[in-house]
């Protein structure tokens, strides 16, 4: 049976409508048939909760994309309609923005259609806290004050390459809590698939990212132990100090995501850059928190506050998530593992070029001299040379890179 993504229209094309909220609380909308019109909050909820009965497919105005955020509602709508028409023809209907709308929903629907994945088990409350605490972000640092020639490299579609790997596994079932003694943990030569509550004694943040909640995946701990020879100290308190998965609860990235990644990467490789956003969006979409925006009189005990935003009327908007249904999708168990696979991948490159690398950000690095000990290329997952430039590193997050003629 085909899985239908919530908020999409599975059998009928809709009118793509771009909207943005105005200061009066109403929503200004635009589509190519009705042009500009305005709806209130109740109408918006009615339209968006019943996408199969309304003629419209609503998409929030994009304020993040560098190109799109400079456009008006009309310009964004025209741009998306052009892309929708192109993709519909290019993919023979496999990607139909007139039915799915947003990048996230389109990627998710294509994943279900191409891969027909197994149904993951419900994520239990005891898993959520550990999954979140183990989900350290990307490797980001810079050699402050560096001002010289830089050579830029990055991995080709790093996260999709991890998802397409037969070497990397992901959980699709419930993890089992375990409490190790220090003796038991010390006797483990190799840590099996799971999450561990430990203290890692790190002396070089270029090659290892510390987690301040002290929860790590087996991947980064095995790397810290075998490659870096770091001391790993088990934490013992009143709670379990590991969440482990049996082999029967795991699936390889290739088996789970392979058809999705292969299909889109082939199109991207042929120059159809319109599909890049879907290729990169899937894993984040699967890990999305099921958030609600509310102006409450009180926060229920089954809700966790994620953020608080003040309103002009003196009230506050709370972003919350249910503690018993924290994620939108039960594939969200992949979150800490895909992040750690990505970190360890680039940290291995840094380790082999420790005297050259002056900046790292997620899947890209800048070096003071060319890399010669790693095979470069443009295939999925390979390290690719991006160019040479005058580089100034201001801090971990900010740098200046002005490309110059390349003699490599």
List where the protein language model places each region.
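Conserved acidic
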Residues: 1-408
């Amino acid at each position: 049976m085909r899985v239908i993504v919530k908020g999409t229209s599975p059998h009928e094309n809709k009118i793509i409508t771009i909207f943005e909220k105005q200061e009066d609380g109403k929503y200004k909308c635009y589509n190519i048939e009705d042009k500009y019109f305005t709806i209130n909050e109740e109408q918006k909820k009615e339209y968006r909760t019943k996408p199969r009965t309304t003629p419209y497919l609503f998409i929030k105005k994009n304020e993040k994309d560098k190109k799109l955020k400079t456009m008006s509602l009309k310009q964004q709508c025209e741009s998306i309609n052009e892309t929708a028409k192109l993709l519909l023809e290019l993919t023979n209907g496999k990607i139909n923005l007139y039915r799915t709308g947003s990048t996230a929903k389109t990627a998710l629907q294509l994943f279900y259609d191409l891969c027909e994945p197994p149904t993951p088990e419900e994520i239990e409350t005891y898993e959520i806290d550990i999954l979140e605490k183990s989900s350290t972000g990307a490797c980001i640092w810079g050699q402050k004050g560096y001002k010289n020639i830089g050579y830029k490299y990055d991995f080709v579609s790093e996260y999709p390459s991890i998802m397409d790997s037969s070497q990397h596994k992901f959980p699709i079932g419930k993890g089992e809590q375990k409490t190790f003694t220090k003796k038991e943990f010390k006797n483990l030569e190799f840590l099996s698939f799971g999450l561990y509550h430990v203290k890692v004694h790190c002396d070089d943040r270029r090659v290892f990212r510390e987690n301040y909640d002290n929860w790590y995946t087996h991947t980064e701990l095995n790397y810290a132990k075998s490659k870096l020879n770091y001391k790993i100290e088990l934490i013992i308190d009143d709670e379990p100090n590991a969440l482990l998965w049996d082999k029967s609860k795991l699936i390889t990235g290739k088996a789970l995501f392979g058809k999705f990644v292969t299909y889109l990467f082939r199109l991207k490789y042929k120059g159809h850059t319109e599909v890049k956003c879907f290729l990169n969006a899937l894993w984040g979409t699967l890990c999305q928190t099921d958030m609600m925006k509310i102006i409450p009189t009180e926060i229920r005990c089954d809700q966790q506050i994620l953020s608080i935003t003040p309103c002009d009327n003196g009230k506050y908007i709370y972003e919350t998530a249910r503690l018993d249904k924290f994620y939108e999708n039960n594939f969200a168990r992949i979150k800490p593992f895909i992040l750690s696979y990505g970190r360890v991948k680039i940290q291995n490159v840094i380790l082999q070029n420790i005297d050259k690398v002056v900046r790292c950000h997620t899947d890209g690095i800048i070096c003071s001299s060319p890399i010669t000990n790693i095979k470069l290329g443009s295939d999925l997952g390979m390290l690719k040379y991006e160019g040479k430039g005058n580089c100034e590193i201001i801090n971990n997050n900010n740098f200046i890179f002005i490309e110059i003629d390349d003699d490599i």
